[in-house]
Amino acid sequence: MSMAFENVDYTSLDIPAAPFSDPARIPDFPKNKVPRHIGVIMDGNGRWAKQRGMVRTNGHQAAEPVVFDTIAGAIEAGVRYLSLYTFSTENWKRSPQEVRFLMGFSREIIHRRVEQMDEWGVRVRWSGRRPKLWKSVIDELEAAEERTKNNKVIDVVFCINYGGRAEIADACAAIAREVRDGKISGDRVTEKMIADHLYNPDIPDCDLVIRTSGEQRTSNFLPWEAAYAELDFVPELFPDCGRDVLWRSIDHYIHRDRRFGGVK
């Protein structure tokens, strides 16, 4: 299946800026107020391409350098975890041609960029379901996870074939199997137990979710982990984003009053 697009040009439309190239530009955020975990819904690639008379796949290509500029900006700001909504379980509804491109492009990006991420101290993580996902994509993700497993600067989670409801359903199914096998009691299921069965239970809850393109919905992204996250809906299409947009959202977050249901 993955061989169908072997002759497709998967190169990006631009070259990303290197991290730490201009330290004077980095905002001086209070270290104790920077969100520990940020999730980004990378939306608007297709519209960006359409506005320029290009095909949708060109929008995805234009997004590649922005992804890594965003990662660089997160490192500079002191963010510890960054989850990127790369391909959802609902994205299989797109045209077969676009799905094939996205699968091949995801595989090639991980393969092409893993050395760079390793040099930056990125620990690559993957969150999502295995069924339907190309084996070649899984192989690249697992190889990148293995190569970078000891890195500690930032964990970057590529959410590929990910759906929040699917993640919760999978966690409940795993708990049900443990109940069936007599490992736990069915009447003692807790929130912590569900959290412990999510795809990456060691990653803390999401503090800030950013969605690009002006759309104001979360689209099944981290519903459990982002239950108390601050939301920032930015107008820019994703290929027009980068570290400056990320920093602006972090600044918005820092100036919000988080109460978690309580009163101050």
Swiss-Prot record:
Keyword vocabulary terms for this entry: Magnesium, Metal-binding, Transferase
GO BP annotations listed: polyprenol biosynthetic process
Record-annotated disulphide pairs: none
The protein's Enzyme Commission number: 2.5.1.-
Active site, UniProt feature: 43, 91 (proton acceptor)
Binding site for Mg(2+): 43, 230
A cellular component term, taken from the record's GO annotations: cytosol
Top-tier EC class: transferase
Domain of life: Bacteria
Entry-linked Pfam families: Prenyltransf
Needed cofactors: Mg(2+)
Cofactor: binding comment: Binds 2 magnesium ions per subunit.
Record-listed substrate binding positions: 44-48, 56, 60, 88-90, 92, 94, 211, 217-219
GO molecular function, a single term: ditrans,polycis-undecaprenyl-diphosphate synthase [(2E,6E)-farnesyl-diphosphate specific] activity
UniProt cross-references to HAMAP family, sorted A to Z: ISPT (MF_01139)
Subunit text: Homodimer.
Function: Catalyzes the condensation of isopentenyl diphosphate (IPP) with allylic pyrophosphates generating different type of terpenoids.
Family listed: Belongs to the UPP synthase family.
Name listed for the protein in its UniProt record: Isoprenyl transferase
Species for this entry: Bifidobacterium longum (strain NCC 2705)
Top-level taxonomy: Bacteria, Bacillati, Actinomycetota, Actinomycetes, Bifidobacteriales
